[in-house]
Swiss-Prot record:
Converts GTP to 7,8-dihydroneopterin triphosphate. InterPro entries: GTP_cyclohydrolase_FolE2, GTP_cyclohydrolase_FolE2/MptA. It is an enzyme of class 3 (hydrolase). Its EC number is 3.5.4.16. It comes from the Bacteria. The record marks 218 as: May be catalytically important. Keywords: Hydrolase. The keyword Transcription regulation does not apply. Belongs to the GTP cyclohydrolase IV family. This is GTP cyclohydrolase FolE2. Pathway: Cofactor biosynthesis; 7,8-dihydroneopterin triphosphate biosynthesis; 7,8-dihydroneopterin triphosphate from GTP: step 1/1. Transmembrane segments: none annotated. Pfam families: GCHY-1.
Length: 359
């Protein structure tokens, strides 16, 4: 006797399943996604087309294909997420490339540079194409850089992105060969420098930042040590510590301020710069130099201020000093500004911690 399996109980074959899936996919192609999802929770996954998993090395992009690519950042204002508010700075930070710089004493130097480029974004614009900032900058990257070249790069990406405000900042480590105090040796000192060009409301400002590392001997500790020696015959040594000042200056329009010029100014203000090459005679000289120039953090800020005020090429400026105490478990800090460029009601919470320079 033959037993027939009811059709309802028979499992569909693979061929039948493939045919059913093809029908489902054809239907889904012309059906709103919400209707597909309403059919069954697993339906969207079933009808998703099979995709190639091999990279198409031979594929080339023509103008028609390029025009078809979605561009969300240039979409309508309806795509804006959150408040329709002006963004003061939007762009890219820390893209690196080798850049040649003009110097006062050593011709042109090529240095690894970290670049930050930003523009303002109007309230009704969704976003920017950030790659344009890099492309605009790279168009000038083979030139020896000065503020004039930075200005041309800024003009390019400000125009490309149709923005009213823009900024470029370039950070690098600037090498200078410096002599020891007495032994006649020389060594390379490296200075963290940043160049910044700001265009805001049609007004442009050229700004230079420099981190200067020096030794600060506490005047109070020096006097107390001398008191112990004089009054009690007790040997005592004053405390001193590695200290850092971040000097930021606005270079007046049409003026040229070399990196080395700013270094000369800060060295004249505080002569106890940390040393590179040191023999015993240099170490003794450094002890004598520190004893001759004891300095509180307030003194340091005002000494730098006096030197900067003396140079007619410098407009507004800011001095941020940190004496990283060897006596205390805290640091002594000061901030001095002149002019509106660097004035601020609030300080970056990490401002002073960013002044630590690890050897």
């Amino acid at each position: 006797m033959n037993i027939l399996t009811p059709v309802a109980e028979r499992l569909p074959s693979r061929e039948e399943a493939e045919e059913a899936l093809a029908v489902l996919r054809r239907w889904a192609t012309h059906t709103p996604a919400s209707d597909v999802a309403a059919l069954a929770p697993e339906a969207p996954a079933l009808v998703y087309p099979e995709l190639s998993r091999s990279y198409p090395r031979a594929f080339t992009v023509d103008e028609a294909y390029k025009a078809s690519l979605p561009d969300l950042q240039n979409g309508p204002a309806s795509l804006i997420v959150g408040a329709k508010a002006v963004i003061q700075h939007v762009g890219i930070s820390n893209f690196r490339l080798p850049i040649r710089y003009h110097t006062r004493d050593n011709g042109d130097l090529q240095l690894e540079t970290s670049v930050t480029g930003t523009v303002s974004l109007e309230a009704e614009k969704k976003g920017i194409n950030m790659s344009r900032i890099m492309r605009s900058f790279y168009a000038h990257a083979e030139q020896a850089f000065s503020f004039e070249v930075i200005e041309r790069a800024l003009e390019d990406y400000k125009r490309d992105l149709e923005s009213f405000d823009a900024r470029i900042q370039m950070r690098f480590s600037f090498p200078v060969k410096v002599p020891s105090l007495r032994s006649g040796l020389t060594g390379w000192q490296y200075y963290d420098i940043a160049l910044e060009l700001v265009d805001r409301g049609g007004v442009r400002k050229e700004i230079m930042h420099l981190d200067f590392v020096y030794s600060s001997t506490c005047p109070c500790s020096l006097e107390l040590s001398e008191h112990a020696r004089r009054e009690r015959g007790q040997l005592a040594t004053p405390h001193s510590q590695r200290s850092v000042a971040r000097i930021s200056v606005e270079v007046r329009q049409g003026k040229c301020l070399w990196f080395e010029d700013l270094l000369d100014l800060v060295r004249s203000a505080v002569p106890t710069e940390t040393q590179v090459m040191v023999k015993r005679e240099d170490e003794q000289a450094f002890a004598e130099l520190n004893a001759a120039n004891p300095i509180f953090v307030e003194d340091a800020a005002r000494s730098f201020c006096q030197a900067l005020q003396s140079d007619p090429r410098i407009g507004d400026f800011r001095v941020v000093a940190s004496h990283q105490e060897s006596l205390h478990s805290h640091d002594a800090v000061s901030v001095l500004t002149e002019g509106p460029t660097f004035a601020a009601e609030s300080l970056d919470p990490r401002l002073f911690s960013s002044l630590y320079h690890v050897g």
